[in-house]
Amino acid sequence: MKMDQNPYEIFQNEFPELAGKFNELVEAQISLKGLDPKTKQLINLAIQTANRNPQGVKMHAMMAKKIGATREEVTSAVVLNLHLSGLAAVLECLPAAIEGFKLE
């Protein structure tokens, strides 16, 4: 197993049944009414930043861009955590957000 492999792909390969159930949960959450898809992705970015998860930030930045979020919206969702999670979380995740936004 390569160390640069996507961690979520590793999870899916090692635990396919559990990953399938997790994907069902994610789909159920995505289908919730009340928030548009872009807002949901921006919230996910903020949550991943609060959790200090650059890999998650990168993934959700790419997903947010695909559904119409601007670079400014993506980076703002990260920086919004400054007073809540601190400078370290923002500095750790901002580069990942920018990198994820550049992905296709």
Residue ranges and their predicted role:
Residues 1-39, 65, 90-104:
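Acidic, glycine/proline-rich low-complexity segments that act as flexible tails and inter-domain linkers
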Residues 72-100:
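C-terminal structural segments of small proteins and small subunits
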Residues 40-54:
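Amphipathic, charged-and-aliphatic alpha-helical interface segments
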Residues 52-79:
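Mid-chain, well-packed structural core segment of small domains
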Residues 33, 50-54, 68, 85-88:
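Residues at alpha-helix boundaries and short interhelical turns
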Residues 46-47, 60, 78, 97:
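Buried hydrophobic packing segments
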Residues 25-32, 46-50, 81-84:
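Alpha-helix C-capping/helix-to-loop hinge sites
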